[in-house]
Amino acid sequence: MTERMSGVLCPVVTPFDDDLNPDPARLIRQCEWLLSQNVGLAVFGTNSEANSLSLEEKLLLLDRLVDAGIDTTRMMPGTGCCALPETVALTKHAVNLGCAGTLMLPPFYYKGVSDDGLFASFAEVIERVADTSLHIYLYHIPPISQVGISLDLIERLITAYPDTVVGIKDSSGDWDNTNAMLERRWDDFRVFAGAETFLLRNMRGGGAGCISATANINPAAIDRLYQEWQSGEAGELQKDLDVIRDSTMAYPMIPALKATVAHFSNDQQWRRVRPPLVALPDDQCSALIESLLQKGFDMPGLN
């Protein structure tokens, strides 16, 4: 039986080559480094530029990661797409490869859809994948998707599929919303904060951890707070994490993360993003890195 996930996971940034094709070799190396820092892999998350990748590219990248020996029990790939058949195909592939979970956006192009419609969408995926090892972690990110997952919808899905719908990533940025989920006390339902900003509060409320963009660059420190959230140092650890995150959030997040990886890996290829995103300009890269270095920041072992 597949174990439910907890801890710190990273929506791994996706490297691109000169022709803007995904670069599997660089992605594999990055995933190996992240695993060495004790964080799991939420590939094809928002910060992975997932919705700038085709279904075929995602399927191939999953295959390449697994072929390289990346531990699938530490993987929660994002599989939610706008088109039902694509969500089914990607989810089924992830399950067949042995991924411990899938992080699933609702179909997000059409706005103002009802809970009935969203329930039907998730239910269709579950019924069509038809695999008892499927574990879905819902992905609530209304600032980006503009299609939210309500508490009532979560309740309906858990009631209908208690062994399949097992958790959620709350990227609403609204602690009251995350706390409302925790207060429902759903049986072994794993609530992940969408940023380490809320990690300490989430753990104190009975949460499972966090799935955070800045785990791409600060994984060990975030994991340390997850491991030591009950210690007397937890408050200071949280403050230290917030300082690094604030430095990164002063810039567009995905280009900033890639610029940071590029600098500390000594590999400028990492700065590439797919349109419509644009790479961080040189002057902003320099300012970001200088800000991080002034705080004693490093990414040991990356290069």
Describe each region flagged by the PLM.
Residues 32, 92, 200, 259, ...:
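Surface-exposed charge patches
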Residues 4-13, 37-38, 214-303:
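C-terminal alpha-helical cap/extension of soluble enzyme domains
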Residues 20, 51, 80, 188-189, ...:
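A generic secondary-structure micro-motif detector
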Residues 58, 62, 87, 122, ...:
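A general structural signal for well-ordered alpha-helical segments in protein cores
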Residues 60, 64-69, 93, 97, ...:
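Alpha-helical structural signal in soluble globular domains
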Residues 2-148:
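Active-site beta->alpha loop and helix N-cap motifs at the rims of alpha/beta catalytic domains
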Residues 130-134, 141-251:
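Catalytic alpha/beta core domains of metabolic enzymes, predominantly
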